[in-house]
């Protein structure tokens, strides 16, 4: 009976540990997303404030002048190339930094997931162990009650 009580309390502790690990995992992922978005937005703000870029109207006028010189197919290629070259400039050096941070966080997350898997396996084994004790306890031969074997006593 003591072994049964010990295994029940151990199962409860492991289940609690699994819940803590799962909540830590989800909290870490949400914090990681917030940090990455803050890092990117702060870097974008500093890059935009440091570099003096022409206004949107100047860019539009320049693009219109260039596009009138090109044919339609060349214009499409030029716009695609400009878009491909402008996106890394917006993120700047933070894309590599964000990728590195994400990789480090995902390693921690994968370690937590592996730990959670191990805890769940142990929990499953303990549940099987407890079920074995329950079945062993209920599979005992029932005690015979002293009943009179009289046909008139059936109710």
Swiss-Prot record:
The lineage of its organism: Eukaryota, Sar, Stramenopiles, Oomycota, Peronosporales. GO terms for cellular component: extracellular region; host cell plasma membrane; membrane. Residues 1-24 form the signal peptide. A motif (RxLR-dEER) lies at residues 34-64. Belongs to the RxLR effector family. It is found in: Secreted; Host cell membrane. It comes from Plasmopara halstedii. This is Secreted RxLR effector protein RXLR-C301. Disulfide bonds: none annotated. Secreted effector that does not suppress pattern-triggered immunity (PTI) in plant host. Its main location: secreted. Induction: Expression is up-regulated during the early plant infection stages.
């Amino acid at each position: 009976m003591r072994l049964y009580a010990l295994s029940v309390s151990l199962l409860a502790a492991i289940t609690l540990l699994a819940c803590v690990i799962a909540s830590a995992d989800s909290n870490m992922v949400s914090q990681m997303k917030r940090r990455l978005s803050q890092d990117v937005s702060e870097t974008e703000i500093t890059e935009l404030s440091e570099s003096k870029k022409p206004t949107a109207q100047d860019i539009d006028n320049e693009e219109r002048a260039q596009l009138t010189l090109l044919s339609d197919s060349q214009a499409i290629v030029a716009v695609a190339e400009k878009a491909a070259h402008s996106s890394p400039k917006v993120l700047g050096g933070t894309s590599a930094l964000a990728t590195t941070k994400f990789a480090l966080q995902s390693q921690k997350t994968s370690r937590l997931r592996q730990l959670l898997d191990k805890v769940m396996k142990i929990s499953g084994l303990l549940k099987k162990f407890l079920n074995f004790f329950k079945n062993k306890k209920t599979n005992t031969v029932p005690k015979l009650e002293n009943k009179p074997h009289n046909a008139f006593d059936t109710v």
